Amino acid sequence: MILLRHGQSEFNLLFTETRKDPGIADPVLTPLGHRQAEAAAEALARRDIRRILVSPYRRAIQTALPVARRLGLGLTVTPLVRERYAFSCDIGSPRSELALAFPEVDFAHLEEVWWPPAEEPAAQVEGRAALFRAEMAALDDWAHTLVVSHWGFIMALTGRSVANGESLEMDPTAPAPAAISWRHP
């Protein structure tokens, strides 16, 4: 299974500069983020990907769409792989707004408000990651899946920190990380 962190978002750009939450809910990609998404699509076009799972945040969808178009695949939106709610950027967009912004994506099964109402404890994110790991391990074709997600969820799933637009491979049948260091670079 391939995990891809979304490209640079407006939040990422401002937070990196100031180390302060800029108050941007569900930010979109920056021009660099779009270039990172296109670069990921080009790199992943040679892979045998048959399924794309994506978080419902705009930045993740914008990152996944170039890959989906290049491979001729649809997106399966799943809040299970969403970011850990910790900052303003983790306030999502309602399903109805996402459906208008991305008419080529099916949001019918998504709740109108799909993100948590308050900050998510680390144990809760790690629990979501464990559930996702088990669901993927039960599939015969997990090796042909791309998951477009976020720093916090990928950290909970693998114990590894990934940069915007970076991908890594993961075997969901392998043991989970023994401990998670929630320190963001």
Language-model segment annotations:
Residues A37, A41, A129, R133, ...:
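Short amphipathic alpha-helical/adjacent loop interface patches that line ligand
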Residues M1, R84-E104, D140-D141, M155-P185:
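Acidic, low-complexity terminal tails and accessory targeting/binding regions
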Residues A45-D48, M136-A143:
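Glycine-rich phosphate-binding loop signature in dinucleotide/nucleotide-binding domains
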Residues M1-L4, L53, A143-F153:
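Beta-strand elements within well-structured catalytic alpha/beta cores of enzymes
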Residues L4-V77, A101, A122-A123, G165:
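Active-site-proximal alpha-helix that buttresses catalytic centers in soluble enzyme cores
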